[in-house]
């Protein structure tokens, strides 16, 4: 039985074109891009080409900066630490209650260990940011606003361009964790007031272990990793050329992505579930949402059990984010949205890619309803509750 993979917000399959682009730099083109001799020239050229590809994917000015990192977590950490170092008189950060752990865990540490005040803006039942609470949190004491472009669990998209404008009025820098958005929705940074953006290659069919932090031209910056002068002194250490090349090729491929086709399959999935499974609800903004992401909560069914039973049937999904999976409590995102208790424990994330097929969606729709029925029959609430 061929496996159906519907967990693309956790990671994606490496594009064959990205792999082929990487292979020479794992073999004959092994040179250090900082070397002056001939062996370093091809890696140096590849580094520049990848930088241009990423800038094009995110619609950024050619003279802005791309800082290659080990992934989204390092990019987020670098942005937050740099903003705090840029103006020591500002010791406050504004973020949201539904950010990825890469941002929230660092903010928790800064608050507990370094005396930074963190404002965590709430969201409504669809995962939309409370704009009035956001406005109220902004002040001349805020060094940085860090808000995600799109949520990794529900797919809800934040209006980051307008949020960045409000941050600048208070004199704060604006960073967006766009790890789940890049490659899935069109992004044009040119002309916006966004200062920094994080991305990760493995979320759009590039390799794991490589990401990037985009910096708007003129943004004050302090490096997280010091040492050599690689990447204009912004990140020390010999660059991961094979990974960066794979990131660049994945960026080129993502520019031609058909988001509309993925959206149609996601809608087919949601409509099919709602038609076949009573007491199911789609979580997230009904309109402003990633085209590949569907978070569905099933009343009176345990999400972890749904995941395990689907896995036995050869279908890969997740309950909440993979980074938070394993806990029996609903994720912090689901809790922040105040999803009712009976549904919160049954939240499942389905995330598609351009490789997802209609046949795979139909396979899920065949297998899922009896699994939910089976689990509800075991529920202490009883199967009668869902009728």
Swiss-Prot record:
One BP term from GO: amino acid metabolic process
Give the positions the UniProt entry annotates as the active site.
323 (cysteine persulfide intermediate)
Gene Ontology MF annotations:
cysteine desulfurase activity; iron-sulfur cluster binding; metal ion binding; pyridoxal phosphate binding
Q: What is its EC number?
A: 2.8.1.7
Superkingdom is Bacteria
Residues modified as N6-(pyridoxal phosphate)lysine:
203
Could you tell me the keywords of this UniProt record? Answer: Iron, Iron-sulfur, Metal-binding, Nitrogen fixation, Pyridoxal phosphate, Transferase
Q: Which InterPro entries match?
A: Aminotrans_V_dom, Aminotrans_V_PyrdxlP_BS, Cys_deSase_NifS_bac/arc, Cysteine_dSase, PyrdxlP-dep_Trfase, PyrdxlP-dep_Trfase_major, PyrdxlP-dep_Trfase_small
Q: Binding positions for pyridoxal 5'-phosphate?
A: 72-73, 152, 180, 200-202, 238
What class does this enzyme belong to in the EC scheme? transferase
Among its keywords, does the record have ATP-binding? no
Q: Which residues bind [2Fe-2S] cluster?
A: 323
Q: Which cofactor does it need?
A: pyridoxal 5'-phosphate
Pfam families on file: Aminotran_5
Catalytic function, reaction form: (sulfur carrier)-H + L-cysteine = (sulfur carrier)-SH + L-alanine
Family per similarity comment: Belongs to the class-V pyridoxal-phosphate-dependent aminotransferase family. NifS/IscS subfamily.
Q: What is the role of the protein in this entry?
A: Catalyzes the removal of elemental sulfur atoms from cysteine to produce alanine. Seems to participate in the biosynthesis of the nitrogenase metalloclusters by providing the inorganic sulfur required for the Fe-S core formation.
User: What NCBIfam families does the record tag this protein with?
Assistant: FeS_nifS
PANTHER family tied to this protein:
CYSTEINE DESULFURASE, CYSTEINE DESULFURYLASE FAMILY MEMBER
Q: Subunit composition? A: Homodimer.
What name does this protein carry?
Cysteine desulfurase
Please state the gene responsible for encoding this protein.
Answer: nifS
